[in-house]
Design a protein with these regions (language model features):
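A generic structural signal for secondary-structure junctions
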Residues: 20-23, 51, 91-94
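Conserved protein kinase catalytic domain
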Residues: 19, 40-43, 90
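A short, surface-exposed loop/turn module that caps and links secondary-structure elements
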Residues: 41-69
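Arg/Lys-rich, positively charged N-terminal/basic patches that mediate binding to nucleic acids
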Residues: 1-38
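Enriched for short, Lys/Arg-rich terminal
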Residues: 26, 66-74, 78-96
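Solvent-exposed interaction patches of small proteins and small membrane subunits
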Residues: 34, 55-59, 88
Length: 96
C-alpha cells in the first residue's frame, strides 16, 4: 500500500539550507550529491510502510511526529490517511 510523500514548506526550506551550508563548507560535489541522495532516498522510502519508525513524543498532545534517523539527518514526519508529510529535516552533525 503506497503512500503519497509531501514536504512541508519548512522542510523544503531546511533541505535548501542544508545544501547551501554544505556548499559553504566543501567544494566536493560528490559529497553534496551523496547527502542530497541520502535525504531523497530516506524520504521517498516512506511511501511504503511509513509506520515502521517510532513516534517522537512532543509536549503538545495534539500533534505527533514519527522520527526517522539516517546517517547524517533526523527526519520528522506525520501520516494522515495515505499521505506522509515531512515536517522537519535536521542535521545530526556536519563532519566533513
Amino acid at each position: 500500500m503506497s503512500h503519497k510523500v509531501l514536504f512541508s514548506k519548512i522542510a523544503e526550506k531546511e533541505v535548501k539550507n542544508i545544501i547551501i551550508n554544505l556548499k559553504e563548507f566543501t567544494q566536493d560535489l560528490n559529497l553534496i550529491q551523496q547527502r542530497q541522495a541520502e535525504i531523497r532516498n530516506a524520504v521517498f522510502s516512506l511511501d511504503i510502510f511509513p509506520e515502521r519508525y517510532p513516534i517522537h513524543k512532543t509536549n503538545n498532545k495534539i500533534y505527533y511526529f514519527r522520527k526517522m534517523v539516517t546517517k547524517h539527518y533526523i527526519i520528522l514526519y506525520s501520516i494522515t490517511n495515505k499521505t506522509v508529510i515531512i515536517k522537519k529535516i535536521l542535521a545530526q552533525g556536519m563532519n566533513i
